[in-house]
Design a protein with these regions (language model features):
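TPR/TPR-like alpha-solenoid helical repeat scaffolds
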Residues: 221-241
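Secondary-structure boundary elements
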Residues: 258-345
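Hydrophobic/aromatic-rich core segments of domains that either
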Residues: 352-428
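Structural signature of tandem-repeat unit edges
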Residues: 1-5, 15-28, 38-50, 57-70, ...
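Low-complexity, Gly/Ser/Thr/Pro-rich intrinsically disordered linker/tail segments
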Residues: 425-506
Length: 506
């Protein structure tokens, strides 16, 4: 059918597929949609709104993947001019134009909320984009300038500006359409800010209308709406209260976690998690390269585990916006790249480096990806380490991104599952006093545990095999196991509801 969304692992292991031809319009293709389709040779898509990272992977027989329609105006030899009437919610980008040899002008007659427009390809007569209105946000300002700092829209000016876009969004919904994910992400905050502006002026009807749009577009910052003084006059308004409750259902992360279904036993035979021994030649090399024995020190096991984490926290800064490192995905290569380029690593790669350091020292360890209930739209996950303490006979939480670990009220170190359970039950948690982000921002229990990690402890996953280069750059890593609340996903070879299985001792 038209306008389908091909979800994660949608055709996983469908060995009967040899060729797939999609209709004219596809909403999106998600990670691993065709993974394991051993006979699939040809994929053909036309207009596709979104292709996820990892959408096309582990397809051993595929010979051709064809994507047509990604350029909106292409191969139109007689086209001279394009006019957009009215306001534009978003353009996507960067390539709108290609292979139009007579094209001279593209004119936007109204305002643009967000644009990613860049250079035209093979359009020798093209003079550039003309925008007769205002552009609130432009990713490529050399091609489409946005409002200057002096013109920055605030208060009533922003409210009036966003009011011109509200009918566009409502019209899309009225016709059964949807606003694409990236447009939701860019437009929801602006509608919320305009709602606040209307509320500050006592324009309740406009404020509630814009707040409703912001929420439908994905606004989920419960703390903002709960604490915003501009909403004080509306606190007793039933319509406002209903809207706040909608935000709470997705944005009050501790509330969402507490409402999650419980885990339960999974009687299926599942493979054991494994840990590469420190005698492996690559791990021996890691131990020698970093001089890990010196870093760990001569203290007891817990002090050694902490020392390794603290050393990495200081050696490589956390940079959540950094891309994938262009090197082999092992601790030595990533460390050398960071020193050579003066760059940092995001939480995933920091956790991979720490994982190899722990394994090299003989501490069984996994890096655990922690994700929110809205994992399919929320890209802000977090990755930490769980390392086995023989001294305590249990897993413990170590986070090199924030130099963080967690204990109960008696000082007992906890693992991610125990932290999750205590958040749900409202039991005491203690974050180490020196937890911090790059020695710039102190971390608190309220911010780090009760907000950020409460959001990201809804769903957990880890690789079955923990080893040197657990996630190679070619994507050939071992299978991942997801621990999810009962009923959140169907049980599969990848998903379990059994927390005891997931936290099994090495």
């Amino acid at each position: 059918p038209e306008n389908v969304f091909v979800g994660a692992s949608a055709f996983y292991g469908s060995n009967e597929l040899a060729e797939v031809v999609f209709p004219r319009q596809v909403r999106g293709v998600w990670k691993g949609a065709f993974e394991g389709c051993a006979q699939l040779k040809t994929l053909s898509l036309n207009h596709v709104d979104f292709i996820s990272g990892g959408a096309f992977q582990k397809m051993p027989a595929v010979e051709r993947i064809e994507v047509n329609g990604w350029r909106t105006f292409a191969e139109c030899p007689q086209l001279k001019r394009v006019d957009f009437r009215g306001v534009v919610l978003g353009t996507g980008g960067p390539t709108l134009l290609a292979d139009c040899p007579r094209l001279e002008q593209v004119v936007f007659h109204g305002d643009i909320l967000s644009t990613g427009l860049g250079a035209a390809e093979h359009c020798p007569l093209f003079e550039g984009y003309t925008v007769k209105g205002k552009v609130l946000r432009s990713q490529h300002k050399d091609f489409v300038p946005q409002v200057s700092d002096e013109e920055r829209l605030e208060g009533r000016g922003l409210a009036d500006f966003m009011s011109r876009f509200a009918p566009v969004v409502r019209r899309i919904w009225a016709h059964g359409g949807g606003v694409m994910g990236y447009m939701k992400k860019t437009s929801a905050p602006w509608f919320y800010r305009s709602a606040c502006a209307w509320a500050s002026e006592g324009r309740d009807e406009e404020a509630l209308a814009h707040l409703d749009i912001a929420i439908k577009l994905g606004f989920a910052k419960y703390d903002l709406i709960k604490g915003g003084k501009e909403w004080d006059a509306l606190r007793e308004n039933p319509e406002f209260q209903a809207l706040v409750e909608k935000v709470r259902e997705v944005g009050d992360y501790l509330y969402v976690l507490k409402k999650s279904p419980a885990y339960r036993e999974d009687a299926r035979p599942m493979p054991a998690f494994t840990y590469q021994p420190p005698t492996d030649s690559n791990l021996v090399r890691v131990r020698r390269y970093f001089n890990l024995d010196s870093i760990a020190g001569d203290g007891d096991e817990i002090s050694q585990i902490k020392n390794l984490m603290y050393w990495l926290h200081d050696a490589i800064r956390h940079d959540g916006g950094s891309g994938r490192p262009d090197c082999a995905r092992n601790s030595i290569a990533m460390y050398e790249l960071c020193k050579r380029e003066g760059r940092g690593l995001n939480c995933r790669f920091l956790a991979q480096v720490l994982n190899e350091m722990y394994l090299a020292m003989g501490f069984p360890s996994r890096f655990v990806t922690c994700q929110s209930k809205a994992y399919d739209t929320d890209t802000d996950c977090h990755v930490i380490n769980m390392v086995w303490s023989r001294q305590l006979g249990k897993w413990i939480w170590m986070d090199a991104s924030f130099a963080a670990y967690v204990t109960d009220e008696n000082g007992l170190l906890l693992h991610p599952g125990e932290v999750r359970e205590r958040l749900i039950k409202g039991l005491p948690l203690v974050l180490n006093e020196d937890a911090n982000w790059n020695h710039k921002t102190k971390q608190t229990k309220e911010g780090y545990l009760e907000n950020y990690m409460a959001k990201n402890l809804y769903m957990l996953d880890a690789h079955l095999e923990s080893r040197f280069e657990t996630e190679p750059a070619d994507g050939s890593g071992s299978r991942q196991i997801y621990l999810v609340p009962e009923g959140f996903w169907p049980l599969s070879e990848y998903a379990t509801y059994d927390d005891r299985y997931f936290w099994q001792a090495p």
